A protein has these predicted regions:
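A short, charged, amphipathic alpha-helix used as a generic interaction element across diverse proteins
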Residues: 39-59
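A short, compositionally biased
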Residues: 21-25, 50-53, 149, 168-171
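Short beta-strand-to-coil "C-cap" segments at the C-terminal boundary of structured domains/repeats
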Residues: 4-5, 67-70, 204-212
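Surface-exposed flexible segments
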Residues: 37-44, 66-72, 164-170
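N-terminal, intrinsically disordered, polar/charged segments of Gram-positive cell-envelope systems
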Residues: 1-23, 74
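Short aromatic-glycine-(Arg/Gly/Cys) micro-motifs in beta-strand/loop hairpins
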Residues: 16-35, 56, 62-64, 69-72
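Conserved active-site-adjacent core of cysteine acyl-enzyme catalytic domains
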Residues: 74-83, 87-88, 92-211
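Surface-exposed loop/edge segments in extracytoplasmic proteins
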Residues: 34-39, 183-184
Length: 212
């Protein structure tokens, strides 16, 4: 299934954050049988697709951005260990750096944060070859799709702390947690409560259209 060819394509930058500086992104929702509609916010499109048994979301370039189906378990091997001294740095800095490290990229994340750049802006600038997705408003269950695709999910947990969701199973999620100085498991229901209380603020990323 793909969007109708007569519908306008996405314009502006391909940040995937629901709106671009020079235009508006459109996200197309399908069930297994039919086209269900178009949304301008990715989180709204995912919410609509998640209500379907086999819902999917695609963009104007026919890329699948989300599917309801995902593996029962997943783990991102590149992020299952943590270097010493991580707890001495801000969790925001360390999580951003860990994402870049996993893609063999380097940047002065500390300096960019000091300049007032947001996490979204830093990833858009430095994570070459990927489109960054603002998944704020999605549920934890919904964003686990990206972990299943082996892309970490950057998640706020409150009090200016963040973690990376790097794995999951039927009962737990695996967290790269700089504030704790460790990679550890958290009960899925507990994680839902923590992240919901923090506003369900998530980021992830998918290969840019030209990279696929």
């Amino acid at each position: 299934l793909s969007p109708r060819e007569t519908t306008a394509e996405t314009t502006g930058d391909s940040s995937g954050n629901g709106s671009a500086e020079t235009g508006m992104n459109r996200y197309y929702v399908y069930s297994s049988k039919e086209f269900l509609g178009c949304e301008y916010e990715l989180s709204a499109a995912i919410e609509a697709a998640s209500a379907e048994r086999s819902g999917v979301v695609v963009d104007g370039e026919d890329r699948y951005l989300w599917r309801k189906s995902r593996p029962d378990r997943s783990e991102i091997d590149e992020l299952t260990s943590m270097e010493e001294g991580t707890a001495l740095r801000s969790s925001r800095e360390r999580c951003l750096q860990a994402i870049l490290d996993s893609e063999n990229l380097s940047a002065d994340v500390e300096g960019l944060l000091e300049q007032g750049r947001t996490s979204l802006q830093i990833l858009q600038q430095e994570l070459k070859g990927y489109d960054i997705l603002n998944l704020s408003g999605c549920t934890l269950e919904e964003v686990l799709y990206y972990v299943g695709e082996h892309h970490a999910v950057y998640a706020e947990t409150g009090n200016d702390e963040v973690v990376l969701i790097i794995g999951y199973g039927p009962e737990n999620v695996e967290l790269y947690d700089p504030s704790a100085g460790s990679v550890h498991l958290m009960n899925l229901d507990t994680a839902k409560d923590v992240m919901s209380a923090a506003g369900n603020r998530f980021l992830s990323y998918v290969p840019a259209a030209a990279s696929q």
